[in-house]
Regions:
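Conserved core of the sugar-phosphate nucleotidyltransferase
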Residues: 2-91, 95
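Structural signal for hydrophobic packing residues in well-ordered secondary-structure cores
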Residues: 11, 15, 101, 105, ...
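Residue-level signal for well-ordered alpha-helical positions
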Residues: 35, 57, 103-104, 161
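Residues that scaffold the ATP/ADP-binding catalytic core of kinase and kinase-like folds
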Residues: 54, 100-101, 158
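Residues that recognize and position ribonucleotide moieties
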Residues: 90-91, 119, 148
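A generic structural signal for short hydrophobic patches within well-formed alpha-helices
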Residues: 93, 97-98, 155
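A C-terminal functional module that forms or caps the active site or interfaces directly
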Residues: 102-134
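Hydrophobic helical membrane-anchoring modules
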Residues: 131-139, 143-171
Length: 171
């Protein structure tokens, strides 16, 4: 719920309504499953908390002490602090983004439109628009736990978390 409050506050004081967009990121350690690996878009930002890159990491596992690790394509294991900001695709876009995304989508279709399994990933499109200086995305950070069902075994925890939020009057 705090993610929506963060977005509402940011929209209320948006310094560049045509160009500035928002993304709520979550602390990586608060997005992991204890039942297996996950993939997360790890966000890189500048000193002003503006998004500079979303790097997709796969095969992320929790590690002791709130840390994490991922394995790259060649099998090398890399440590993560757990403090990294993960994109869970909680975006706050101004309407102007859709003209920009439309142009990128046309480029995508001309390059990969005939591939059966090609996908137009919003985080990659946003990174590309940012690199082209068409938009800026301010990263807002939520310290809430993010929960979802990545594995069947996650379901009871998610159900309990939702019940707890309802019982606590949060939802």
């Amino acid at each position: 719920r705090s993610a929506y409050a963060l977005l509402a506050q940011a929209f209320a004081v948006n310094p560049e309504p045509r160009k500035r967009h928002f993304m709520v990121g979550f602390t990586l350690r608060n997005t992991l499953s204890e039942f297996g690996t996950v993939s997360r878009g790890i966000c890189e930002t500048d000193a002003d908390s503006l998004l500079t890159e979303v790097v997709e990491r796969t095969d992320i596992l929790p590690a002791p002490g709130g840390k994490a690790r991922f394995t790259d394509a060649d099998g090398t294991v890399h440590p993560l602090t757990g403090d990294e900001i993960a994109s869970m695709n909680c975006w706050g876009f101004m309407p102007s983004i859709f003209d920009e995304l439309g142009g990128l989508f046309e480029e995508f279709l001309s390059r990969r439109g005939t591939e059966m399994k090609s996908e137009f990933y919003i985080p990659f499109a946003v990174s590309e628009l940012s690199h082209r200086q068409k938009i800026s995305v301010q990263v807002l950070t939520s310290t809430d736990s993010w929960f979802g069902v990545t594995y069947r075994e996650d379901k009871p925890m998610v159900q309990k978390s939702i019940r707890d939020l309802v019982a606590g009057g949060i939802y």
